[in-house]
Amino acid sequence: MVPVLLSLPLLLGPAVFQETGSYYLTFLYTGLSRPSKGFPRFQATAFLNDQAFFHYNSNSGKAEPVGPWSQVEGMEDWEKESQLQRAREEIFLVTLKDIMDYYKDTTGSHTFQGMFGCEITNNRSSGAVWRYAYDGEDFIEFNKEIPAWIPLDPAAANTKLKWEAEKVYVQRAKAYLEEECPEMLKRYLNYSRSHLDRIDPPTVTITSRVIPGGNRIFKCLAYGFYPQRISLHWNKANKKLAFEPERGVFPNGNGTYLSWAEVEVSPQDIDPFFCLIDHRGFSQSLSVQWDRTRKVKDENNVVAQPQ
């Protein structure tokens, strides 16, 4: 048995870490030994930067474009991609079985995951990754500089022996990361660059609610923005509040993101509170103040306007 990508020729044709000017192509695979009823045993999702552009699962046996890519003609031969993913599914699940056999646990519930892909900057290859995990722990990864598979789990030593049984497999893995994957990414960008380079500014609202004890929670919500990077925090008397929790940035489900920050304010605190937002969609920072003159009840909304 050989690595998932190396067991058959690539069915994709040649091509005609992210920072500004960089693009990356990533594949995420998940295999389950005992999936819940109706849940696929194997799933694969491909991403261009942080945007999913096709999905495959073992229930349908089809690779299908998602989001705006479902409207793009000629980007991929989806029947050939489906064939490729079905072959990868079979090999991926065999690897999961081999690991379970090593640990003499052939009936347990286990998860095997893979991530591989590449990045280009200024139209040149600038990075790559290929690694696997078993039950959430690092299992094995490929070092393209050596090149070799590096075991990160006792069972992975056997996997390494199988995957390096012939030297050609190691060289093909290196070639995939350094040549084939970047060329594939360049080809996809011919259909995707305008979508990936777009800038959607956030819509910002502030809500307020009273909590037990009489204090009020101000919530500053930014949503519908792209790209993902955003700075969002509360200020009081021109000082950043360090005590509000970090909320992170979350996908909206439509290719954009949302984030929020909250602050607890006592009725006696009359200082002005501002929510400050920085995003590439704004030419300058957006500052939004809660209007204390409003006759507020629970969940009143203020829509942000640039100042």
Curated annotation (Swiss-Prot):
Per the annotation, which location comes first and is thus the protein's main one? secreted
Q: Which domain of life is it from?
A: Eukaryota
Please tell me whether the keyword Transcription regulation is annotated for this protein: no
Q: Where is the signal peptide?
A: 1-17
- Residues bearing Pyrrolidone carboxylic acid are 18
PROSITE patterns attached here? IG_LIKE (PS50835)
| Disulfide bridge positions per record | 118-181, 220-275
Q: Which residues form the Ig-like C1-type domain?
A: 202-287
Which InterPro entries does the UniProt entry name for this protein?
Ig-like_dom, Ig-like_dom_sf, Ig-like_fold, Ig_C1-set, MHC_class-I_related, MHC_I-like_Ag-recog, MHC_I-like_Ag-recog_sf, MHC_I/II-like_Ag-recog
Pfam families recorded for this chain? C1-set, MHC_I
Q: Which residues are glycosylated?
A: 123, 190, 254
Compartments where found: Secreted
Q: Which UniProt keywords apply?
A: Disulfide bond, Glycoprotein, Pyrrolidone carboxylic acid, Secreted, Signal
Name the Gene Ontology biological process terms. Answer: cell adhesion; detection of chemical stimulus involved in sensory perception of bitter taste; regulation of multicellular organism growth
Tell me a GO cellular component: extracellular space
The record's family statement is:
Belongs to the MHC class I family.
| Matches recorded under PANTHER family | MHC CLASS I-RELATED, ZINC-ALPHA-2-GLYCOPROTEIN
Q: How does it assemble?
A: Interacts with PIP.
Job of this protein: Stimulates lipid degradation in adipocytes and causes the extensive fat losses associated with some advanced cancers.
From the Swiss-Prot or TrEMBL record, give the protein name: Zinc-alpha-2-glycoprotein
Q: Which organism is it from?
A: Mus musculus (Mouse)
Report the gene name: Azgp1
